[in-house]
């Protein structure tokens, strides 16, 4: 009787594990399908422009700094956010990244700086209208919140030293699944975050 009871419990556990696995797999496929549908509009788009608002938040400072600028996204792999007349910029040109902070330029590459590799892959996926496979990116999570698709990139460091050297702990992109608009990009860092919100999108 005890053996049967133990066997039954084991069977229940196995079934629960299988159910959980298949449910999470189904959820993942569904969310990726939602994302693919949300960005399909970009297949027929060469350039996207929008107004940008940058919010810089520091935990130690009570008041956020808010500035204005523009967003330009262009096939095949160009993304440019220019703030305050170009004094602050975030530029992706293929694998090359440039950050301009208060007029000072800093350059890096996704090939030498892995924390930007998935960032590049996600934006290229968007600009290609959902062509490609993001499911193999272990540092990317795709979720749905109301009418929005949320993409969270959490770079994985291979050591504590590498983790300390990371500029950002995570990137969060918000895409409207009905309009295909990139609504926000948030970059979390130690002691604060930088968030860009975008309005007035024009698809050309």
Stretch-by-stretch model annotation:
Residues 1-11:
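N-terminal secretory signal peptides that target proteins for export/translocation
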Residues 33-36, 40-47, 51, 56-57, ...:
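Flexible, processing/modification-adjacent segments and terminal tails
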Residues 136-204:
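Gly/Pro-enriched, hydrophobic low-complexity segments
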Residues 70-121, 194-195:
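An acidic-aromatic
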Residues 26-30:
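Sec/Tat signal peptide C-region and signal peptidase I cleavage site
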Residues 52, 79-83, 97-100, 151-153, ...:
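Short hydrophobic/aromatic-rich beta-strand segments that constitute the beta-sheet cores
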Residues 66-68:
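Low-complexity, intrinsically disordered segments exposed to solvent
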